[in-house]
């Protein structure tokens, strides 16, 4: 079933990817079923005290797919928002929805009312699947969204029934013996991921079975995942990095074992590494720094760890050099985006490349350009904006013609917004962004979105949100406010933003008050000048 609002690859390009074997006819649930045939009694997934073998996982997915279909009356083409922490129910729901052709929106645990309501409204989702999160009123968020949106027919609760929102249905009551129908074909639009974006409107990224499975397969080839791989999922399971680079799907494809971490603390992670003999883990730079600090004092044995992937933001050379001597494993830098392109340092790259670059594209079919502002190619060693197209890089955002016009060229190249330098060896060094976006430890914050919320405050006349350098997170956010009369307290501003349902990571780390915001000659806020003043 071809979805409206989805931009397909041009036929000539799509045929090239089929002929090369990059795109196959396998769907994501069929990939899991194929692994279950080969590794039926092997443990596929561990979460807390629960474990699923490949056979059990497939059986549970089938039963849940039947429940979604027959109890909730979901059908192919419907949308569902998944707002789940790192629990086994995330993968059960993800595979089950795909199996019957329902297209999940993979919301992140950090998203709150504002974002969840938007995802449900924009996609006309029929169901919201959520669960308890420590310190988050997920039940209240779900009830409020459901009250706002008549199109949202069902709330599904994947947690203790005593905490369940009124009117919700418990996920554990949905498992049926009936067989759910298969989704359509591999090149159909399968699910949504989310772009950090630079505007106040989150952009939805449509992925197909074919392009996503190729991304996973190519990642496995580079990262050498196998049935012996034991992957620790610390980052949010819904995020592209731990889902497909190679992530959990790569582990399932190879017949390995995925272990879910209930929180991101290094103490929890090190305990799980020792317990399950973890071989691979993926982190963002701030977590990697915490691991390096914890390694000096831990009593846990983490000698099984062979590879530590670090991505999501620039990892400093100084920190990168510490990984091998202090953690005893190989560092693999990862630079990618939910829109597609993934770069890896190779496991056998020289140490000098591993610690100073963010890798190179993983596929021979990745076509990339490094251009100046005028659109001219720049030589190696010179910074430019990265453009890319290929068999797993999307051709457009979902129902977003204005964004697509700005973000994609006529030839189908995606303008990443990343400023990079290509080394003589062909690796990329990420040196910045050309978009008004803050990268707070791997979490992308659109300055415009936060500014729009700030301008809704009665006291705020003008607002600018900028990135300020931070040794730990890479960047932190700072809001500079011009107020109408008496300046409110910074804590009041933060409380106001939380009250509007903004995710915690988007709340400015610092709030300052100024008499006037510096402007460019054409009247726009001069954020470079503002940063100098701060």
Locate predicted features:
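Structural core segment of the AMP-binding/adenylate-forming
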Residues: 102-170, 484-486
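Conserved AMP-binding A3 loop
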Residues: 53-55, 190-214
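Conserved ATP/PPi-binding loop(s) of AMP-dependent carboxylate-activating enzymes
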Residues: 361-365, 376-407, 445
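AMP-binding/adenylate-forming catalytic core of the ANL superfamily
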Residues: 111-118, 128-133, 390, 395-396, ...
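Conserved AMP-binding/adenylate-forming core of the ANL superfamily
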Residues: 22-25, 29, 33, 41-75, ...
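Conserved structural elements of the adenylate-forming
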Residues: 58-66, 205-226, 234, 288-292
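Conserved AMP-binding/adenylation subdomain of ANL enzymes
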Residues: 101, 213-230, 240-280, 294
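Gly/Ser/Thr-rich phosphate-binding loop
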Residues: 278-282, 294-353, 367
């Amino acid at each position: 079933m071809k979805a409206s609002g989805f931009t397909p690859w041009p036929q000539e390009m799509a045929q090239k990817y089929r002929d090369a074997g990059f795109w196959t006819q396998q769907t994501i649930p069929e990939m899991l079923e194929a692994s279950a045939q080969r590794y039926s009694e092997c443990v596929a997934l561990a979460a807390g005290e629960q474990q699923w073998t490949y056979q059990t996982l497939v059986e549970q997915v089938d039963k849940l797919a039947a429940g979604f279909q027959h109890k909730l009356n979901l059908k192919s083409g419907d949308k569902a928002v998944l707002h789940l922490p790192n629990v086994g129910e995330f993968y059960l729901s993800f595979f089950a929805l795909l199996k019957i052709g329902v297209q999940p929106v993979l919301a992140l645990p950090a998203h709150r009312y504002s974002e969840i309501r938007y995802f449900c409204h924009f996609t006309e989702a029929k169901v919201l699947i959520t669960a308890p999160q420590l310190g988050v009123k997920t039940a209240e968020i779900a009830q409020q969204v459901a009250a706002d949106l008549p199109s949202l027919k069902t709330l599904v609760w994947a947690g203790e029934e005593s905490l369940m929102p009124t009117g919700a249905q418990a996920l554990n009551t949905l498992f049926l013996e009936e067989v759910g129908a298969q989704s359509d074909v591999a090149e159909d639009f399968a699910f949504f991921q989310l772009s950090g974006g630079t505007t106040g409107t989150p952009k939805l990224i449509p992925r197909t079975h074919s392009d996503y499975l190729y991304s996973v397969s190519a990642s496995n080839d580079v990262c050498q995942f196998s049935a012996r791989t034991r992957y620790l999922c610390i980052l949010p399971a819904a995020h592209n990095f731990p889902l497909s680079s190679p992530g959990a799907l790569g582990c399932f494809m190879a017949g390995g074992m995925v272990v879910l971490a209930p929180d991101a603390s290094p103490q929890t992670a090190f305990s799980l590494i020792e317990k399950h003999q973890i071989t691979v883990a993926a982190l963002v730079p701030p977590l990697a720094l915490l691991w390096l600090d914890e390694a000096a004092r831990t009593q846990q044995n983490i000698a099984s760890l062979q590879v530590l992937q670090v991505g999501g933001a620039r990892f400093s050379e100084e920190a990168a050099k510490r990984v091998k001597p202090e953690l005893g494993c190989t560092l693999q830098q990862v630079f990618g985006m939910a829109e597609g392109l993934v770069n890896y340092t190779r496991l056998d790259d020289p140490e000098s490349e591993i610690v100073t670059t963010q890798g190179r594209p993983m596929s021979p079919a990745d076509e990339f350009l490094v251009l100046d502002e005028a659109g001219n190619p720049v030589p190696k060693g010179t910074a430019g904006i990265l453009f890319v197209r290929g068999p797993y890089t999307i051709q457009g955002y979902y129902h977003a013609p204005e964004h697509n016009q700005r973000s994609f060229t006529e030839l189908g190249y995606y303008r990443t917004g990343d400023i990079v330098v290509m080394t003589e060896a062909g690796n990329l060094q990420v040196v910045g962004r050309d978009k008004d976006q803050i990268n707070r430890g791997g979490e992308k914050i659109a300055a415009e979105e936060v500014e729009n919320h700030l301008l809704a405050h009665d006291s705020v006349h003008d607002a600018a949100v900028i990135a300020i350098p931070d040794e730990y997170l890479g960047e932190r956010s700072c809001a500079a406010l011009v107020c109408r009369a008496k300046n409110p307290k910074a804590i009041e501003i933060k409380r106001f933003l939380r009250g509007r349902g903004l995710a915690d990571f988007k709340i400015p780390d610092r709030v300052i008050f100024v008499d006037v915001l510096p402007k460019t000659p054409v009247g726009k806020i001069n954020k470079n000048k503002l940063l100098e003043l701060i």
